[in-house]
Amino acid sequence: MTTGSIHNAAPTASDTYSNFADLAAHEDEGLHWTRECRRVPGSDLAHIAIHGGHIEAGTTEAALACAGSADNYYSFKGIKTGANRTLHVTSTDFDEPQCVDLQSGMARTVSWHGFSGGDKITEVGGLDHDFSYWITVSLQHAGFPVAEAAPERAGSSPLNICNRNLAGRGVQLELSRAQRAAFFMNNDMSGGNRNNVTAEFHRYVEAIQAAYRRLRA
């Protein structure tokens, strides 16, 4: 298990910043980004969205809803008027202190992500294979297309923030743009519409929560 900070000399090729400290030195909290962290005593499950807000739209909303009032929640949110992609720090480099500290006390983690794609699909990755199994079964039972994560989205590195918990393993969910858009009225993922969730959103959330109940049964 790795819980300390990551110090990279250079960012991942597709990223602007190498880690959180690099980002925070160039982007202003409250103006360009915010972070939310809610801890629930007695819960050892965290739903995290490290590319939330306008970075990978819909991931913050999914993480928050799935955590509900019972489980822990974290989101790093892009709030810029444009170019929020510059706030993306890849999962193996993400070391924002509140998230790292939360993860250090968790036995289970679901890390929420988005990727481009015109077909509805959820790719399931990470190192927590037991939880991944039940999430896959539960989503499929609810009618959602599911696939094993593509290699570039597999979440298999021990340095991935989803795996940096007490168990050294978590689940990484990659939701296509089409799937995330279906969570909001008129497929509109703009910031002003992301409070207007659909029945499909609620069905998806229930499937994830049901998977955790089955895991613990």
Question: Where is each model-derived feature located?
Answer:
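N-terminal catalytic or cofactor-binding beta/alpha core of small enzyme domains
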Residues: 2-217
